[in-house]
């Protein structure tokens, strides 16, 4: 049986994180299932230098967000987990409150009920109290909230490097091993 990862892409800004996850997963043996929301499709065209068809080609299987009867809607369909990148506040709220109105939220609900990793990359700033409460709710339910904040201690060379490192860290929460440099501690020139 193949090892499967589900990628959900919602209408929040930051489509490059979902695209980069798909690109990184192409270098692995995982079977990748993509669910792209209608608003996500608009934002892919708006903010990324990709056509929706190009993004879809990065996945092994593409599911219609309205098809709540797709394989990923059932716990009997085994996956290694799910990453929602980017995750809109609407999607986060729906997951937090058990509202499974589309295939992304239903697949997330399945991940939680089956105790599979669910990683959410929320894209909003600043967070309001409702956002934070919803993040706490999904965390209490077993999800991992992973805002795409870049790290600087490894000396990223450019924005693309920051996106890759951040996305690779998110995928590592699903136990996906992708090739990026690991932190090796402070160099002797930076030690106190």
Report residues per predicted region:
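A cross-family phosphate/adenosyl-ligand binding-site feature
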Residues: 1-119, 123-192
């Amino acid at each position: 049986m193949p090892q499967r990862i589900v990628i959900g892409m919602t209408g929040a800004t930051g489509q490059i994180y979902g695209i980069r996850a798909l690109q990184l997963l192409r270098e692995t043996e995982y079977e990748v299932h993509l669910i792209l929301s209608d608003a996500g499709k608009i934002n892919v065209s708006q903010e990324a230098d990709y056509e929706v068809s190009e993004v879809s080609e990065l996945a092994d299987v593409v599911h219609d967000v309205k098809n709540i009867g797709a394989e990923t809607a059932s716990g009997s369909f085994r996956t290694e987990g799910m990453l929602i990148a980017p995750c809109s506040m609407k999607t986060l709220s729906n997951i937090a409150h058990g509202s499974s109105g589309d295939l992304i939220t239903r697949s997330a609900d399945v991940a939680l009920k089956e105790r599979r990793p669910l990683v959410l990359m929320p894209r909003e700033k600043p967070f309001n109290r409702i956002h934070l409460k919803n993040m706490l709710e999904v965390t209490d339910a077993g999800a991992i909230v992973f805002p795409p904040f870049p790290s600087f201690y490894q000396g990223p060379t450019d924005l693309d490097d920051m996106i890759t490192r951040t996305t690779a860290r998110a995928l590592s929460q699903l136990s996906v091993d992708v090739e990026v440099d690991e932190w090796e501690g402070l160099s002797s020139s930076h030690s106190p």
